[in-house]
Amino acid sequence: VKACNHCWELEDKGLGSLRYHFNRSYAYDEVVKATNANNFFIPDLKLRYIDIRFSNKCNLKCVTCSSGWSTAWYGDSVQLGHSLPSEPKLKSIENTDNLLTQIYDQIDNIEQIYFAGGEPLMLPEHYKLLNKIIDKGRAEKIALLYSTNMAKLTYGKWDVVPLWQQFKEICVQASLDGSHSRGEYLRTNIKWDNVEANIERLQKEVPHLNFNIAPTISWMNSYNVVDLHREFIEKKYITVGKIHANILHNPPQYALYKLPKGHLDALVNKYNKHIEWIKTLDAPDNLKTMDILAFEKVVVYIKEGLESKVDNHKEETYSIIQANLDKLRKVDFFNIFPEFADLKNKHYYE
């Protein structure tokens, strides 16, 4: 299966993979032995790992996101005609109290919890669960993993830092797609100074923090993501081996293949130069290889697109969809991303 190639490639190079991680972390012989062979029923289920997303409540309205994943997007979505005013803004688990009760019953068994959203650090249910775990004396036995936008570490009466200090492990995968003004455009409502301040606070106050960045690469941030990675390593916000890059496929108007051939060629050159820079870093080879593979997979994706690319200029990269969104939000994409000045369609600015 083609989708499995990334894990196999990592393992062929002697590195860990998500496949290997799950097979190693969640291999419980007693579960296999207790499972009924006829209906796969487990009479005394003990949950070790939970992946939970309580709702779509979020403080950001990222360009490539939608109201289904962020409540902050709802107003723009209605104005643009993407959502009906009658549709619910908040999409959440139907009976949160019942779910929490079921999770509370499993606290003595849980080893790891993955929180995503929405934005998990602004969900009251998330804080209720952490406090319950602490009250039961289980925090030192449980690792927490987050996908968070790093916009804030506090919400209402809660501050996540003193809670995290009590848990066994804290792994953060920061959803950051760009830096400075580009980052603020891509993840609307975020303030870059706050992001850096939050990272620095965590480094000081949560010493067992495992901090990673997990950018989603679209054509818009395709140049800047390299600068983001290098800046974060040079500022010691991350170490080598701490980038988990995802290639955007949807919404399709933001996919990498929308770029003209000239830009795709330039990106291959930029990424290859960045890979050479990674090789010079003072870090273990296995960690450097992880970062190299993260960028090499983008190069491969671009080259595959170049093979079938027909540059007839009929297909616009900066679409009317994006132009309408920028007008609504009163931002000028080309002022923030001058590297794409050649893509500007004056018709959209009349």
Sequence positions of predicted segments:
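Alpha-helical packing segments of well-folded alpha/beta enzyme cores
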Residues: V1-A3, I50, L99-Q102, L129, ...
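Core AdoMet radical
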Residues: L47-K57, G68-N95, D108-P124, K136-G156, ...
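Conserved C-terminal portion of the radical SAM core fold
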Residues: A143, F167-Q173, W192-Y348
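Short, well-ordered alpha-helices that flank and scaffold nucleotide-derived cofactor binding pockets
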Residues: S67, N131, D135, E234
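Leucine-rich repeat
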Residues: L100-Q106, N131-G137, V161-Q165
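Generic marker of residues within folded, mature protein domains
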Residues: I42-D44, K136, Q203
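Distinct, well-ordered alpha-helical segments
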Residues: Y127-N131, Y155-P162, N224-L228
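N-terminal pre-core extensions flanking Radical SAM catalytic domains
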Residues: V1-L90, Q106-I107, D291-E350
